[in-house]
Curated annotation (Swiss-Prot):
The lineage of its organism: Eukaryota, Fungi, Dikarya, Ascomycota, Pezizomycotina. Coiled coil: none annotated. GO terms for molecular function: metal ion binding; metalloendopeptidase activity. This is Mitochondrial inner membrane protease ATP23. Its EC number is 3.4.24.-.
Length: 276
């Protein structure tokens, strides 16, 4: 399968939107001398988890419903079902992607703004794929809904998309990253300074619609009425920064997000307001 071409780079060299919060503090967080160890992931052991992939799926489903499978086993079961339904999930994702490019006001607006910076986002570099999830030794489940790469474009994790609205939020999030990449010289690697990553994650969570009140209440069960939007954006930005290789821990991620919060949360570009 051919690798999708990257979005074309823009010649714009304006600096990213963090002058007030980032430049006022000359103290840069020093990069860790050694990278934190990579998490170890668990393979399924039927004797430990209760999930046996050699039997019919509905028998495992019954065992899950009757509490005979551990939480880890449920995740391994889910992953195997994703593998079995990969073709169906990717076909549905591609159909929804085509619909959103044709009819979604948010997606069409962002695509036009990316094109204005000499970039291209279409079906050749916005791809739907199955994204494997893994269970770490500490019980954490590592999964993602999508991703952006300056070299390859946008990845949509077809197996994680609940519906077209969820895909719209995910695609808008990654398109904000693409716009930031073309508009500014974003340091995606971290390079000891995670402020670029923190800023673009704040903006993507804020502008994509993934933190709107209806999404938080109906999907995530968060019925908080005060500061719900700000808390959601901050939490998701911290989680994304924590996934960067140069981030030491949650304290480090929180510190970096707080340093750029005021300037990046107030920057609505390329929109005029938060519409979703």
């Amino acid at each position: 399968m051919a690798t999708p071409p990257p979005p074309q780079l823009s010649s714009t060299s304006t600096q990213p939107p963090s002058p007030s919060s980032a430049s006022s503090n000359p103290q840069q967080p020093s990069p860790p001398k050694t990278q934190p160890p990579l998490p170890r992931f668990l393979d399924n052991d039927p004797a430990r988890t209760g999930y046996d992939p050699t039997v019919k799926w509905w028998l495992n489903y019954f065992r899950i419903m009757t509490g005979q499978v551990t939480r880890e086993g449920v995740e391994h079961y889910r992953e195997d079902r994703y593998k079995a339904n990969e073709a169906r999930d990717c076909a549905r994702c591609e159909a929804d992607r085509a619909y959103l490019f044709a009819y979604s006001p948010t997606i069409r607006f962002l695509r036009d703004k990316v094109a204005a910076l000499n970039g291209t986002l279409d079906e050749t570099n916005v791809v739907c794929r199955r994204c494997p999830a893994r269970v770490a030794e500490d019980g954490r489940v590592v999964r993602q809904g999508g991703g952006f790469s300056p070299e390859h474009g946008i990845l949509i994790c077809a197996n994680e998309m609940r519906d077209r609205s969820h895909l719209e939020d995910t695609l808008a999030h990654e398109m904000v990253h693409a716009w930031d990449h073309l508009r500014w010289k974003v340091d995606w690697s971290g390079g000891g300074n995670l402020r670029h990553a923190a800023c673009t994650e704040i903006r993507a969570s804020m502008l994509s619609g993934e933190c709107r009140w209806t999404r938080e209440t109906m999907t995530r069960g968060n019925w908080t009425l005060t500061q719900q939007f700000q808390n959601c954006v901050r939490m998701r930005a911290i989680q994304s920064v924590m996934a960067r290789p140069t981030c030491r821990d949650d304290v480090h991620a929180t510190k970096v997000v707080n340093e750029v919060w005021d300037s990046c949360f107030s920057d609505k570009r390329p929109f005029e307001e938060v519409y979703r």
